Amino acid sequence: MSYTNGGFDPTTRAYAAIAAWWLIGAGAALTLWTARSPISRLALAAPILLALYTLWILLSMSWAPDGERAFQQFNEVSLYVAVLVLAIALARIVPASWLVGGIALAIAGIAVISFLSRVLPSTFSGSTQQSEILSALGVRLSFPLGYWNGLGIEVALAFPLLLSIMASRRSRIASALAALPLPVIAADMYLTSSRGAFAAAGVAIVAFLVLAANRWTALSATVAAAIAGVAAVYVIRPRHALVSGQMATPLGDHQGHVVALVVLVTGVVIALAWLGAAELGRRLPTPPSLVGWATAAVLVVATVAGIVASHPVRRFEEFKAPSHLTGSANFVEQHLLSSSGSGRWQLWSEAVSQFRAHPLNGEGAGSYDFWWLQHRPIPLFSQYAHSLYLEALGELGIVGLLLLAAALLVALAGAVRAAFLLRSPEVAGLAACAIGFFFAAGYDWVWQLAGIAVVGVGALGLALGALPSSRAAPWGRFDIARPALALVAVAAIVPQVVVLAAGLHLQNASVAAANGNLRREKSEALAAKAVEPWSSTAYLRLAQVDLDVGKLGPARSLLESAIRRSHDNWELWWYAAQIDVRRGDILAAKRELDEARKLDPNDVAGLLSQAGAP
């Protein structure tokens, strides 16, 4: 999914969810999920709580301003429930080392593809295009996800997984190979200019060091990763043509080839060095615990001193201020070293304001975008609050946040407990990966990028599923739960098919419109409306068809139906005003324009200014 726009599109998520739920249902029906030992109660409780959160999202369709968006969000979280259940089941029957290796290899593959798209841009067609999600600054690396912070955070999640393989004593070759992509990942993080990626990596690595049984080996692997990262950034930093994405120039092309070669050599050197260091480490005695505690104390003191020296109060004030950074030759480093929150403080504040207006049940899933456009204090476009937890609070109220928090806390507690009990570096790496993801979800919209979210949720499920249980609960071996699980899987597939069918019909309608085939456009829009009658998008498409052939009355009627299904969408009111102007109903157009201005003062004022209207 990472390669398909980060799994952002509803149809992409629907395909993945159908596949995941089908595997769950088929596995339950064919008794593939039978484990040798019972599943822990935490591993049973977490998916149930997340499923309750998903049902609360579905229920919010009854009061949300746009049922289509709420339904899409329900299907999105349904995918994550499926991933969590599937991961828990897989953890019972597949060795953790295989699972960690597979996830690490997949993320490393994305990192390599992204790196090559910058240093050798001709390797991947479309790698130099702007994001389909955002109008990206070309200077920031975003291919193939389309969002630089998302890319940086995803590749950062590979660190605890790779470190766990390096710290494992199962295979010397695998341990050395795990060090190979370290400089590539660091290079990607620097080129994305994502401070969130470095924060997620730091939290995930610290979590791994805490959870790992052999902390000296884990610390040594971390030092090796740091050396690889510093070396990669040292090589890239002075090559401004490469950093700024000017790869069509001879200088940029030359710098790309040089950096590709140096980073490759760095990876090989680090891998060989780790192979030798690991062999040496096996022969050396483990330092006494007193040395370990002293080292930990030094690191804590150094961290606290660094925080104090950075003037945290001043940094916090800078974080709250809107960003004024612009594209420049030194943008990447300037942005990495800045303290600006890039509007996050304002986004978070409005999520809290939305909660205060609807404290119990929120305004409904998918409503934050409308609230932000109506109340935003700065001219920043954003569909999301850039915080999973604050957005859940604003959209779904205290009930939604408590359900989400309960699911995550139960799952994380089980994952951490599994890491400590099993003393497995792989389980520690999975738990740390999950901690890093859910930390990042607190300050960026990675939850909406399914390509990243399935990594975090999947790692959480795998660590949680590894938790042993000494109590044979009646549901513990799926004997009773198996038929129910199969039925739930079938039921969960149905809404995914609805989203998929409606999305494909609307995509076909867009293609037909681009080709001037109004008949096909209308038939596809009618099919989308039949599949998803609460979809305002389908009604808007039908209105556009009638408008193209001059049927103003039917177009206005269809637009009214769209407005009833998405009454806080200012664009629908704007289109209605335009149609009524053409119909000569100036009073109606004025009312609709006033409504659009109330729902989005900034954009409507800009459009009126362009049109020369008062």
Question: Would you name each region that the model predicts?
Answer:
Residues Y147, G327-Q383, Y389, L396-L403:
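TM-adjacent membrane-interface loops and short helices in multi-pass inner/ER membrane proteins
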